[in-house]
Amino acid sequence: MESNLWFVYAVVTMLFWGVWGAFIERPEKNGFPATLGYAVWALTMVPCAAVALWVIGWVPEHDLRSIVLGSAAGLLGAAGQLVLFDTLRRGPAYLVFPVISLSPVVSVLLSVLLLGETASPRAWAGIVLALLAMPLLSYQPASPSSPAKGRLWFVLALLVFLAWGIQAYVLRFANATMRSESIFFYMTVTGLLLVPVAVWMTDFRRPINWGPSGPWLAAPIQLLNSIGALTMVYAFRHGKVIIVSPMINALAPVITIVLSLLLYRVVPHRVVVAGMALAAVAFYLMA
């Protein structure tokens, strides 16, 4: 890993995504659908991409390899998000999120097998603890009012699990031959291309809040997500997937949980508290 830049970018990503996670439900609870929230997120990627392009003189790599790798990273992330919307319609969140939360397992395996990444015994201990913490942090008590509908939800959850796990590997692989700014540009383009799909998935038969507490609230919240996505790409440029991916995915939810406790007085379940403890130890070991 190159100096400690990976750590700085990873921490910034965790902070932005942690705060984003604490507020992301507000627009939806106010009547602004999550699918349209995706469209807002895709638009907030544009100013971040503009900054990235400015850094490299407004000329991203445009050879076929760069276009394919950058677009693949974007499609895996954005398509995974859209599939998640449909997954949550078919299966309860308390079953879906523990499956998806383990996507860094895919990232770690691919990076070890295909990139030959290694880590110290101390870091490996942190990686294992982070992977154990993720399903605990996403734990939600079973609810009789939201039973699973068939088995398709599990297949869809696995698709998201694979997509997001492979995305982290692709980001690191792409960073070896192209600039991070170019990767983010293509991620933005592919995210925008899928906006019509998100709009198509929206149920316009239900009332939609188009006011200040709807899309206008979603915009600054989603901007946090977009900035975090940009710094995540930089983190993968300077750091190893086997360290960066588990760290970000384990620590960002901890920040969300702490903020939810402070802002909404939401007391986490003891299973979640156990996950927070594991994540904290993992962070110390991997830092």
Locations of the language-model features?
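Hydrophobic residues within membrane-embedded alpha-helical segments of Major Facilitator Superfamily
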Residues: 16, 23, 76-77, 83, ...
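Alpha-helical transmembrane segments of compact multi-pass small-molecule transporters, enriched
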Residues: 44-48, 99-113, 190-194, 228, ...
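Hydrophobic alpha-helical transmembrane segments in multi-pass integral membrane proteins
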Residues: 49-56, 108-119, 164-176, 225-237, ...
